[in-house]
Design a protein with these regions (language model features):
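Short polar/charged helix/loop
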Residues: 2-206
Length: 206
């Protein structure tokens, strides 16, 4: 894992998480633990309206957290109720945290290769609907990261568990002097909570 990401992780691991928030996260902890105990793949699809901000941050930080805690066979993805584009400020925020990100195209919906270590497969980031071919079709947890998707998408085909974990939208800061700070704070919150989830998982290894 890259040095700058390790430094960022050390900082976010000490961020406080309220008991109320831990209760919200408990359903995801239970889902992951069940899969790990049964020696099954852990497929998690983080869903928001546009798959541009919160769902990508959740996907990426959850994958990093699983790697950090050596939780096997975790496959995180993300999607929206509609496709737009991965918002550039999210990319900037991740780069500032220590990720190495390559942009593969200049299309309206670019594809990004997101790396946090040389020894693992990179994360592929681009906006897509939650049922895109890139995502699992069945046997996954659908984690709803925004109120709009949670309310507007009551049924997610193929999901075996639906888990609402709502994050505030950093979009409210777009076009303001506070944008960088707000995106950094939201990324750190999401990272902290995903690291909490995977820190709670007990593996079958001795």
């Amino acid at each position: 894992m890259y040095k700058d990401i390790k430094k960022s992780i050390a900082e976010l691991l000490v961020l406080p998480i309220s008991n109320e928030r831990k209760e919200t996260l408990s359903a995801l902890v239970a889902y992951v633990q069940h899969k790990v105990t049964a020696d099954l793949d852990v497929n998690i699809n983080f869903i928001c309206t546009h798959n541009s901000r919160r769902s990508h941050l959740s996907q990426i930080w959850a994958q990093v957290a699983a790697s950090y805690y050596n939780i096997p066979r975790v496959f995180c993805c993300s999607g929206g109720t509609e496709a737009t584009a991965l918002y550039p400020k999210v990319v900037d925020t991740l780069v500032n945290t220590g990720f190495v990100i390559d942009k593969l195209s200049e299309a309206d919906n670019p594809i990004y290769i997101i790396k946090y270590a040389d020894s693992v497969m990179p994360i592929v980031g681009f906006s897509k609907t939650y049922d895109h071919l890139f995502n699992p079709k069945r046997g996954f947890a659908a984690v709803m990261t925004c109120v709009q998707a949670d309310g507007g998408c009551p049924f997610v085909a193929g999901a075996e568990k639906r888990i609402p974990i709502i994050f505030e939208d950093p979009k409210v800061s777009d076009g303001t002097p506070e944008q960088t700070k707000v995106y950094s704070q939201r990324s750190s919150q999401i990272a902290s909570e995903m690291f909490y989830v995977f820190s709670m998982i007990k593996t079958n290894r001795c």
